[in-house]
Swiss-Prot record:
Phosphoenolpyruvate binds at K21, G91, R119, Q166, R342, R383. This is 3-phosphoshikimate 1-carboxyvinyltransferase. It is an enzyme of class 2 (transferase). Monomer. The lineage of its organism: Bacteria, Pseudomonadati, Campylobacterota, Epsilonproteobacteria, Campylobacterales. The gene is aroA. Keywords: Amino-acid biosynthesis, Aromatic amino acid biosynthesis, Cytoplasm, Transferase.
Amino acid sequence: MRIYPLEKSLNLTIDDIAADKSISHRCAMFSLLSDKPSRVRNYLRAGDTLNTLKIVELLGAKIEDNGAEIIITPPQKIKEPNEILECGNSGTAMRLFMGLLAAQDGFFVLSGDKYLNSRPMARIAKPLNEMGAKIDGANNANNAPLCIRGTKFERFSFDSKIASAQVKSALLLAALYSNGCKFSEPELSRDHTERMLAGMGANIKRDELEITLEPMRSPLSPLDIDVPNDPSSAFFFAVAALIIPNSHIILKNILLNKTRIEAYRVLEKMGAEIKFHKTSSKYEDIGDIEVRYSPNLKGIEVSENISWLIDEAPALAIAFACAKGQSKLTNAKELRVKESDRIAVTINALKQCGVDASELEDGFIINGSEAKFATIDSHGDHRIAMSFAILGLKCGMQIEKSEFIATSFPNFAEILKKMGARVEDRAC
């Protein structure tokens, strides 16, 4: 992908941001928890979430997609598939399916692309196996392909040492099909799983950082949901509005869950002009986000609620690079094991652009600098590619391996063009 510098300000409303990826994954998976059809509108039709939908179909569900909505009719009982369940590039899909399938009757194999199969899975496999699951794979079940022989667990308690929505969700799904659990975490992680399970009728309660879940005695209620647009995907364009002079963007129908908009709160602390307009609430708070050009962004130190902004960190680094002074992100070691080593890849790419930046073991330091055109390697990481596309609106950018953008945001390049950007996107 080649991006050329913008020659005008951005003044538009964007209503076609990609649907929320986290919610879409869960809509497909959690439809299996009911005995009636779930109806899902605005499902994310991107590589990762379409793979999840395909897996649900292989597990026995009937999928009807009429364009306006997807109707998922669950099987009476999750069936043992006769082929490998391919998760593509999605760690969320693989880790949540590990929990869901660990308590089913049958044999299942989860795999993904070369990037996903190199990512760590022991954080899920180890606690599940300690509770009685039978999960095996390379390097003591740390890498896919993973083999799962379903079994029922006794009731368990688990005190997580990390704030991870994926660890939490996997264990809750396994417990739901077994004998329930108590789960505690050091700080609140993304809570979509708890919200959606409660909305479907599960007996789940939260007391500060502890969750109590009772086993599923009967099927849950089906979903009937309009998936909101993804705040992580919208964040790229929020950063664009902040750094392109005289810009004003309204981002429509965005998920406003507090565990998903922390990166916007960081921008506000840096001096960004951002307004939130809540419009509706069912399973989640939804609304519009209004962002204006903010020429006086100042550096900041960020060390708290990192799990709430982990996906936005590469784009946040672009905002840091365009701010005045030094910014520092710490407690973000999780970035090392995402689709790429996002600390190393982000900092190396910024250096190529002439930005004064350095790695920390658990984050990075960035001094605001004038960026210049560069050819950067995204290392097959969709969020790296999109983040540097946004920087390219200021200084131009050539991005290698940009085809991975399609795993989460198929119409990203089209929105850039609608904004007035000149984009050569043969890879997309």
